[in-house]
Amino acid sequence: MTDAGKTARLNRISTDDRLLTIPMDHGITLGAIDGLVDIEATIREVTANGADAVLTQPGIAPRVHPNKGDAGYIVHLNASTTLGPDQTDKRRTGTVEDAVRAGADAVSFHINVGSDHEPDQITALADVAADADRLGVPVLAMAYARGPGVDEHDAANLGHAVRLAEEVGADVIKTAYSGSTESFQRVVDATAKPVIIAGGDPAGDRETLQGIRDAMDAGAAGVSTGRTVFQHATPGAMTAAISAVVHDDADPEAALARAGLVVDA
């Protein structure tokens, strides 16, 4: 029964085994930044233009459902702030049961492999995965290589992080992009679970799309990108361009043209 539920919920956030999700959980971390003040308008724009799912903290759920259309909804269950002493120290913000009551199709949880808080985060992710499995809810693990002396984009480190996430019970794994198709293939090969890349800091449109294209060519299952989209001058158009790369195998130039965006250098 739980496997059927998990499959059904996975199909609500991705219907072709590829995933474009727009995380909007930055309010805890950074405050009400541009693009998230009127989060309802942003949700409407991105979901109308190809986002498969949006992601927020549980308390934002009432602002999500009236505006997301048919898109899926992922609830994130831990956080830290830029005002705190250690951003790698992610603390629980809810339970799987809270997420289900909030109408989630999946839950997500962040772990920093290599940080001082890694042991506690492994335990917490395992607990979330066990609770989610019991309820038939998919788990998206945000598994990063972060900590003192840790190279956040090293393929071996990222491969370790995604394999850890699989072994603890994640169904989909988000991690940083290693910077090249060849190196990211090693990350993807480290796990049997779908791997999606984080968007990272905003860059030029073509550069962003080329990175996603390269990751997809390496075997990535999609992308989870927030500020690149919701702080874009036209979030809907940027969502459409990314969707073309993820779901239609478009190259950056074709994706930009399809979305009506100017091809930058």
UniProtKB/Swiss-Prot annotation:
- Residue positions binding 1-deoxy-D-threo-hexo-2,5-diulose 6-phosphate: D25, H26, G27, I28, T29, Y144, A145, R146, G199, G200, G226, R227
Q: What Gene Ontology terms for biological process does this UniProt record contain?
A: amino acid biosynthetic process; aromatic amino acid family biosynthetic process
Q: Which reaction is catalysed here? A: 1-deoxy-D-threo-hexo-2,5-diulose 6-phosphate + L-aspartate 4-semialdehyde = 2,3-dioxopropyl phosphate + 2-amino-2,3,7-trideoxy-D-lyxo-hept-6-ulosonate
EC number from the UniProt entry: 2.2.1.10
| Residues at the catalytic site | D25 (proton acceptor), Y144 (proton donor), K174 (schiff-base intermediate with substrate)
Q: Name one GO molecular function term.
A: acyltransferase activity, transferring groups other than amino-acyl groups
Keyword annotations of the record:
Amino-acid biosynthesis, Aromatic amino acid biosynthesis, Schiff base, Transferase
* Family as reported in the entry's similarity comment: Belongs to the DeoC/FbaB aldolase family. ADHS subfamily.
Under the subunit heading, UniProt states: Homodecamer.
- Function in brief: Catalyzes a transaldol reaction between 6-deoxy-5-ketofructose 1-phosphate (DKFP) and L-aspartate semialdehyde (ASA) with an elimination of hydroxypyruvaldehyde phosphate to yield 2-amino-3,7-dideoxy-D-threo-hept-6-ulosonate (ADH). Plays a key role in an alternative pathway of the biosynthesis of 3-dehydroquinate (DHQ), which is involved in the canonical pathway for the biosynthesis of aromatic amino acids.
Q: What is this protein called?
A: 2-amino-3,7-dideoxy-D-threo-hept-6-ulosonate synthase
Q: Which species is this UniProt entry from?
A: Halobacterium salinarum (strain ATCC 700922 / JCM 11081 / NRC-1)
Instruction: Name the gene for this chain.
Output: aroA'
